Structures are given as C-alpha cells and as structure tokens.
C-alpha cells in the first residue's frame, strides 16, 4: 500500500506509520526471553528467573524500546520509498484513533528545501588588494623591537647609556610608584598601593594617574583629584571625589634593540643576514595579507550568494545549530576558566539569527558545489596543507600532523571547498578591486 505523505506547510510533512501488533509482540517476547538469561532478581540465580516474572517487571520498558526501534525502522523505509530528504529528527505521536490489530503513529518532520541560486553575474563583490613594501617591513620591525624592549634606570650610566640628562618620567618609561587615595581625609579600601609598576602612555592606567606621574622625578610627589562615577562598581566610593597622592619610586627608560645581526638571529636568521631577515618578514607579511584578503572576500562572496538565493530554512536545522552554538559558547567559557561553564544557562534564542544564516549558507553552498562540481580534490587539499605548513619551523611535521587526523583533514577539505566556491563566484560576479594598506586590511579583517 502506498504511503500517504501529507503536506502541512512549505517544508513540514506528516506520514502515518502502522505497525502490526503481532509483529511487535513477537519482538517483545524475543527480547524478554533474551533478558531472562541475564537478569538478576533476589532469590534466583542469574539466568534462572522465570520468564513470566521478567515479563511482569520489564514488559513496559521492553515494549517502549521495541516500538521506538520499529517506528524508526519503518520511518526510514518510508523515507527511502518516497524519496523524502528529511531535515533534522522527526517527532512521533500515537494517533488518536488506533486501527484494530496495529499500532498507529503520526511522524511529523521537515524536508530539505529547493534552493534557487540567482544569476551570479548580478552578484557584486569588492576585492581588497595590498602590496608589501619597505614601509610595511619597517613597521613590523618596529613592533618586533618593542616586543623585545629592555628597561634601564633613568640617570644611571649603563651599557646603553643613561637615558638622557632629563631624569623626569616620560611617555614610554616604566615607572614604579606608591599611591594613597583618601575621601574626606580617610583612606579607603583599594585606594592604596606600594611599588606599583606601569608603563606611561600605554593607557593601562586612568588618565588622571598618567597625567600625575608624567614629569615627576624619583622622590617627588603629586596630589590630584579623581571623581568616581555614580555607577562605579565600588559602592563605598561611587559618586564621590577622592584625593590621590602619587610618589615616584623608580623611573626606567626603554631601550629598543638595534636592528643588527644579533637582532636577526633572535628572529631565527642563523647567519644574522639582515637582507634575509627582511625577506622573511616580507614573505610572512604577504602570507598574512593573502590570508586576510581571502577571509574578507570570502565573507563578501557569502553575503552576495545569500542575497541572490531563494530558499526556506528548516526550523529543525536552525534549532540543531543553535544547540551547537550554545555548546561552543559553553566550551569557550570553560577555556576562560568560568566555574560550572558546562551548565551555564545560555538561551538558544541568542543564536537564532546566527544559526539561520549558517544553515541557509550551508544549504546554498551545498547546492552550488553539487551543481558545479566544486568538491575538494586530494591535490588541492595537499597544496593547502603544504602552504599552511610553510609558516612553521618543521613543515613536514605539520603535514604529518594534518594527515594523521581525519577531523583536521576534514576541516582543511571544507576550507578548500569554500575556496573553490569563492573562485567560482569571483569568475562570474561583478568584481571591483580596491587597493588598501596592510593596516587597513588588518583592521577590516578584525571587524569581519
């Protein structure tokens, strides 16, 4: 008998599942017989419990298990027979009217939608390009020098000088101070510290502290007012004005290493050759620029695909992705050391919009890949792994690391598929190239 699939909406369907009671009962009896061989009950040796007693105690549980298994099997059979592309998990409910000699259930579920992708020639994408020159290399070297800064006591002669004749604290100096804060001449909790270090100009301290410390010499003090906002977390001082006195204990000036052979060696250039060092920095910057431009243009391509595509999104898939995002959020909290992160009450509704976009995009990409043969080829995957491995000291070990784990390899395969999609769309869309600086590129990719 043909199965009747009811259309309940754009994607929602319903089908009736009928299970002969005698078939179900035979399976229940068989399982109880098997259970009787292992079940333990007081007063009986294992395997010697009468089947009738086992049935009395476990019949309900076994019946539920058998029905669940049989319903699932029958639904799978119907799905294949009717060529149903089921999205998510179906829900099963007993029918109000049961046929004689059979169990009847309604299976309600969603199917995958038809995906209509519009004309790719109408898609618009802005592609950023950037050039790496001496200015970008010099800027990177400046950052690397600052990462290797050494501080020396200002005014004391040393290997690198004394920091100049002016011994007052300047921006860039690391200072060590004592400070005392009072409200109405009474010290308050948290308002006092000794030997407190910070670097002037980094912005870690309140502006009032920075201003007070600037220009002081060792042993000098300065008093200033600090008004706490009404919503300050410390209730005892919220909305009040405190008088702070800061006393300079130590001033250390920053010494940046010279860009010489030793500096090059510290960056991994064994012979200290400065030309090689600049060449490697340029290669690294070009790889980073390529990665950032690819990421930005990929996001633009995905946005363009969503704009020209028409499809209904199965609610079941959105709900599944919401739960995945909730679990990812909990894992992130756990990695940050948040207590009881795995049980954090994170509402799935927070991720509704994000989940809908992810699911919709996944369906569009799957259709585009299938229709245009954009699957990842083994040689493409290997080429990407090799490219990624170049930035590590032992590329061969990185390659082995990828190919030793199917999940890592699957992630790289997904990346290649996305790259194939991006290249395919760029070959057909309206693409505008825009030259941007490396700094602007870094800022744009951080916001993407």
UniProtKB/Swiss-Prot annotation:
Species, as recorded: Burkholderia lata (strain ATCC 17760 / DSM 23089 / LMG 22485 / NCIMB 9086 / R18194 / 383)
Name of the featured protein: Trigger factor
Pfam families reported in the protein's UniProt record: FKBP_C, Trigger_C, Trigger_N
Function, as annotated: Involved in protein export. Acts as a chaperone by maintaining the newly synthesized protein in an open conformation. Functions as a peptidyl-prolyl cis-trans isomerase.
One Gene Ontology term from the biological process aspect of the record: protein unfolding
Main location: cytoplasm
Family per record: Belongs to the FKBP-type PPIase family. Tig subfamily.
Location in the cell: Cytoplasm
The protein's enzyme class: isomerase
Keyword Kinase set for record: no
